[in-house]
Amino acid sequence: MNQKKKQKKTVYPVLFSSLRMGLHQMKNRLVALPVHTGFAHPDGRVSSWMTEFYARLADSGVGMVIVANTAVAPDGAVSRFNLRADRDEFIPGLAGLAKAIKRKGAIACLQLNHAGRFAKTESPLLPSPMNSSNLSFNVESLKGFMEFFPFEKRFNLTRYFIRQVKAWRSPMNAGDRNRVIGDFSEAAFRAYQAGFDMVELHGANGYLLCQYLSLFTNKIASGFGGDFLGRTAFPLAVIKAVKKRLPKNFPLGFRLILREWVPDGIDLPEALAFARLLEKEGIAYLSASAGTFNSIFSPAAIKKMGKTAYLRDDVAELKKSVKIPTIISGRITTPFLADKLVRDGTADLIGLGRPLRTDPMWVKKAKDLGRKITPCVNCNWCLKRVILEQGFNCSRWPRLFRERTELEHKLLTRNYKTLWLISDIKDMQTFKNCLPLLVQDKKKSSYPTILFIREKNKDHFLESAQKDFIQWTKNTFEPLGFTDAPLTVVKKSKANWESAIHHEIIHGNHGQIFISADKSQLWRKRMLYKERGKVLALLGSNNRQHKVIVPVDLSAATLLVMIFLQKTYMKRKGFSLSFVHVLTGQAGQVEQRWKKFKKIAGFNKNIPLQLILPKTDVVSALTETIQTGKYGTVIMGKRGLAGLKHWLLGSVSSGVLRHLTDQSLFLID
């Protein structure tokens, strides 16, 4: 018994010792490595779930959290849900993210990246065109990549890969290089403005900086290619520009690839030589990595990466080559191993990627030998999900948290970037009357985009009303602090309205669409049918918007509605929400399911569910409840209580829509 008590007090003194890192003192030797989450909104903004996710990592007890893969340009994003820092409007979200990390006691670092040829863009940037010498290896790596995924996913992935390979024919010119250098420096300055303590440049994983270093991807004969020093010219130019833009002594780290595992690729001797150049440039630390998307799916690489501390020997050589702090990564699975690597002088810092995501209590459990760490089993489920644009998730997380994460990711496309559709003066008045519904969260909302749909012929009276409405919007929103993005106004003629609206929704990455209700104009109702994966609101004239009824069928659609409400109207003072269910089965089963749903959505366990006994059918029961309860707003899942798999037509939500008089209706798809 005494021995057990003694063990529980045991910690790893070296692992939990402090270390000076640039201007900052790290409280221990543990770093949350950058692992791409895919938790940003489609327009690149920080989402509330991303902030919550990184705050949880910071709360784990690590000394530093590195936010992964922030694109410095639109053509540098590796994912549809990539965090971005290429415009000033991203600064408020980044500032909230940095603040959330630092509030939990960790140093906040933002990793900046340009994905180069791996970017999701029609015209990817790359040092030189792909030639026949590495085409065969790319094709072979595609085979290994495809075997990594279920058969039904392979066709679309193959088509995407072939499309990318075809685009790998146009090399960057001098203008491209100068622009990207500027993109890195400006993004770094935005990170500083947002309150991050450090910035890291991503020079690994086969992304753009790595592509210039590698003879596999850089076939330029001279200048920015050729010999080793020529191939270092571009990344060094980026570093110089970034350091010039940042305040003096602001810490700048570098994610360094030690081995590329491709023909003519970066190997340890060149990596160590480059590390010494980085040290001379004033880099604050080096974070080691290995492999690229061209190599990590090969059987040989999978075997290497399956071993614990597989970069141990290489990082030991790196530490001997430089005097700045080094971070080791690569399956550091236990605190004992982590402590030993620091004690032995293999590395100064321990990087925890997937192990810390698998068990956010890893650090706290390391201080208590009586608690068992949930290990990462290297199943790569998280990687598959990220590649398939489904967001980071872990097979070892509790089921409720996995489900919650899936829901949060689905809401990223309903990203609260709003579009107001207005065609006449009556619409403008309706929007003014429905102001409480338009402002869902004062802390996280931004200016809407107003799309005016008008007749081809000029109407001076209508144009004057539009100007007044724009001014009303500014006067209303500015006092609320909506300053992170400008008010955008778009005007379209009446010809082919619906096509123009759809184009604006897609082009603008709008997640919420507000329309004024008018039963005489069928195009408004058709909007609810056509747009998918959005929040669609039909605004009525009822002035009791604060009294909200939420019909739920306890399907997956209900969970989406619950998460949406938790982020919006449930936070607003003065709103009263009633959750109702038309009972068609056993009340006990419904109550149990409601209890489970509240856990998944993070609802207060005391929120009740009102059960309605239908006299005839579900639609009649709901519409009667809406009318007798004098509700002003209805919020429900688009598929309706019947759980039908078609869009809206014939569903319960369609029936409710037909019977509404002056209420506002929100459909969450």
Predicted regions and their residues:
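Flavin-dependent oxidoreductase catalytic cores
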Residues: M1-Y416
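Structural beta-sheet core signal
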Residues: A32, L110-L112, F254, I328, ...
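Helix C-cap/helix->beta junction micro-motif
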Residues: K104, K248, E281, V322, ...
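Small/aliphatic-rich secondary-structure junction motif
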Residues: T413-K467, E478-A485, Q545-Q610
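Structural motif
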Residues: L421-I425, K491-K492, I515-K519, V552-L554, ...
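Gly/Ser-rich helix-loop-strand patches that form or flank binding pockets
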Residues: K432, V439, E498-K547, I626-D669
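Charged docking surfaces used in two-component/phosphorelay signaling
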Residues: V489-A500, L613-V619
